[in-house]
Amino acid sequence: NRIFALEIDHSNPDIVYFESNGDLFKTNDGGLTWSEIGDASFQSEDHNVKDIVMHPSISSELYLSSNRGFFKSTDGGLNWTEIMDGEFQEIEINPSNALMLYTIKVVDNRTEFYKSTDGGNSFTIQTAGWPNPTGPNDHQERVEIAVTPANPSLIYANATGSANGGSGTYGIYLSQDEGTSWTFQCCGGQPAGPPSLTNINMMGWDKEGEDDGGQYYYDVGLAVDPVNPDKLHLGGVNHWVSNDAGVTWVCPAKWSEPAEPGYVHADIHDIRFFDNELWIACDGGIFMSTDGGTTMNKCQV
């Protein structure tokens, strides 16, 4: 069975939550036994859970996004309150203010960015500078967001979709004011468009970013270095790195170059930092780096 969302208790690693095939499970004994959790109302809905996030200091408080809405639990997942209905994607918590949450909603052919300042009890949409597909064939339905303790006011967004005659990377966006407003960082002078050396597509198979399309609906990842707020790691088919806040990007090693020290298997789904270790989950397993991604090592799992 595929697992689409997982969270580990920050204070007790024996407590783990995960979603599989629309059901939510919890273990209290390090995975020896599992129980399906959620009240009757929650379990009655066919959830496609996209993210589960735990409050950084209150382990009984959880946030969950799914195709059915944005939910909050205050009792370790036994009961869930729907905060917003609709289809939601990723959740992030401000690194210096646990009352401030961010999440992404999908509406028709676009995404919307929502911000909470009261611990996820209510949200407001923030539209200034956010991707806005307007053409008859344009769409922008997937976003990964990332934050960093190095600068808690920053939020990066990796938006994918199609516009202006090209598809794949729709744009890299940056907020410097906790999501109130956004600026377009990359690539080229407009969202999407035909790929070229000056308008690269990081969702495709090409190391130079000159091929159109890719798997921008399937493998999308983003993380910010915990020490350097200008350094980003992005995942699509390949692993990409930016050292200037998302303006320019390089691919250290193509998916088909396993001999290169920076090689990561194709189809990246998640990128995370644990302290200063970089971890990447992909269709080839898990890769880890202790030098900021210069050298990637495959983990034996």
Across the structure, where does each feature detected by a protein language model lie?
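Extracellular glycan-interacting surfaces
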Residues: 1-301
